[in-house]
Amino acid sequence: MRQLHKQCAAPQQHDARRAARTVVRVASAEPVTSAGAAAANPQTDFKFACPICLTTEFVVQGSAPYQACRCGRCGRSFEAKGQYLDLTLTSGVAQQVYEQKMWQGTELFRQPLVSFVYERGWRQNFAGAGFPGAEKEFEMAMQYLQPAQGGVLIDASCGTGLFTRLFARSKKFAGVVALDFSESMLQQAQQFFAQDAALKAGTPIVAVRGDIGRLPFATGSVDAIHAGAAIHCWPNPQAAMAEISRVLKPGGVFVASTFLTPLAPLGELIGDSTVRPLSQTFNPFGRSNQTFRYWEEDELKDLVAAVGLTDYTRTRSRMFIMFAATKPAAERQPEQW
């Protein structure tokens, strides 16, 4: 049996023909569990993928500190910032001139002050829009995530790890990946992880800096993805949804919560299509001074359908919505001659 370890490990180089055959199965997010480990707290390896080629596998055991990962195929190393891995495209690169222009919603949550106050008052303000609170939202999400329990859960845009901790404490998953683009959010999350005694002997957590538009996982390798109060801050929601669909296994579940337009409560009474002309006034996504967007429910349905997810379902209250969808089984492809 392969020995478990705490560092990233790239697989040995293969010839081009062999690599082409193995692309579809490398970098699975499935855990590999030691047969000798205690059932209550198994040793779990997590598998990630190089964010450039998506084929080179990095194996990580769920405990920090981590070591840097190197992709021999791409000739690139990806940094480990002690308590989290950085698997973004610019990790380990000192760019001389080029700078990616960021969506303001992304940049806002990279500010250390925002990360500090997020669980110290910021998140609680969501109640005014109809969010029922973290504990209730967690319970709702767990209902949607039942088919994926026992697998690995990606808590995407995890922020300070509010839901990551709840998922790990539940012990319903083999492992939880806390994934966010914000360095300061991940640093704050690690502080909360260290302070939470209930996590010390529970479900393993790996913290990763990653781009929701370029997820560092292999195609069809992830059991479930949760994105709590996040999609309204994503710079390109359609591209992010395509990535989510790509990495989910057949039968994998995606669960997310977000803000509906301020007129959503009226829309529930008289129909969203009736209030749509007014709702669009509150949805100026293209304006550069906006940090997030409000959604119509039909827009979320469109995003889900466009990337091939099915079985859309939701819970809605005032401006709050939690929705879920499933990756269907792959259709049988005709044999190629």
Would you name each region that the model predicts?
Residues 30-108:
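N-terminal auxiliary segments of SAM/dcSAM-dependent transferases
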